[in-house]
Amino acid sequence: MKNAAVACSLAGVFALAAILGSSSGRAAESSSLQEHHLRLYHTHTGERIDIVYRRGDQYIPEAEAQLDHFLRDHRTGDVKHYDPHVFDILSDLAAAVGHPSAEIEIICGYRTPWSNEFLRSRSAGVAKNSQHMMAHAIDIRIPGVDTLALRNAALALGRGGVGYYPRSQFVHVDTGRVRAWCYGCSSLHTNTE
């Protein structure tokens, strides 16, 4: 009788473990299939893209290629492979400001060295070794979101560089080292990266 009770108890424990294991397996499977989505509008080309770029922790190569083309140097047409973590910053930033499905306006994506030098010759706010030339940076704004609030949300993420350009109404985000600057602000330092 005692052996039967122990066997019954063990069977119950194994059944509970199987149930818990399958439900946690489903949760893991669900999170591994979570889709990460971006809606972007390029202010210089007029192009739009609405794309799932990552499922779970796996970036989608075809989506990356489409985003690389979308973010090409609009002056030369040159394309460079983007650091996909920039896409995560955009997605997380839109969520952080309460607009997870917002269409993000792209002011500038990839820049060739030629384009970067062209811009540097016209503005002191363009860095000589810009992260844009490595396809690690994007300049953005989100319609309906104050750019100062967008900058503050980007700073709160604590990932990479955050530049604030209040006169031009955009925020720069990149995957370089963590740092911040403001071009055209009197209260923040004005170094450019």
What are these regions (language model features)?
Residues 64, 87-94, 116, 120, ...:
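Extracytoplasmic/secreted envelope proteins and their assembly/folding machinery
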